[in-house]
Amino acid sequence: MKFRTATLHDAPAIARVHVASWDVAYRGIMPDDVIAHTTIAWRTGWWSAELARHEWPVFVLEAPGRTGEILGFCHVTASRDPDADPQTVGEIPSLHVLPHLRGQGRGRMLLDRALAELQHRGYAECTLWVLAENRPARGFYEKLGWRPDGGRMLYGGTDVPEVRYRIGVSPQPVTAPQGLVKGIDSTVDREPDRV
């Protein structure tokens, strides 16, 4: 497997992972009409615009071999929360892995890569938002040391509550041991400008 920074060319592949992950992780939590609106075409457009900005990286994990299939991705940025200092607090807006590959350590590896990026840029903390009812995701983050910090909001345009998690960005990010770690890979996504 290989990590790399996504390019604009990767938008369709990232969109496919994103939609597949949403369909499995959020079904029964997110309203059906929101999930139905989350199409590959819509996500491709969204990711094309995001990747074109070149402000912050989206890290992708590629399958070994010549195919270069994207297995998962993690987006990292400065915090977008009004109560956070975007100079010292980073954010993970999206972490997604193909559903059939969860529990094999890929999500953790992507998350570690994103935290390493924040550490490299001198950030002290990182936050992310998790749907309150997404117990597998919450367990995944808590197992890795993330803790709820009291931040709560509704997912853009819905009545679905989200909980904010926070972790310090250590000088040496936790890394997955050699091979893959058994655990729960999860999904998190927050796009307040979503229709």
Language model features by range: what are they?
Residues 56, 160-164:
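Short hydrophobic/aromatic beta-strand or adjacent loop that forms the aromatic wall/cage
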Residues 105:
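Glycine-rich phosphate-binding loop
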Residues 1-3:
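Extreme N-terminal starter segment of soluble prokaryotic enzymes
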Residues 124, 147:
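Short acidic/polar active-site loop segments enriched in Thr and Asp
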Residues 5-9, 19-100, 108-113, 117, ...:
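Acetyl-CoA-dependent GNAT
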Residues 102, 128-137, 154-160:
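Conserved beta-strand-loop-alpha-helix junction that forms the acyl-donor binding cleft
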Residues 141, 146:
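Conserved active-site tyrosine of GNAT-family acetyltransferases
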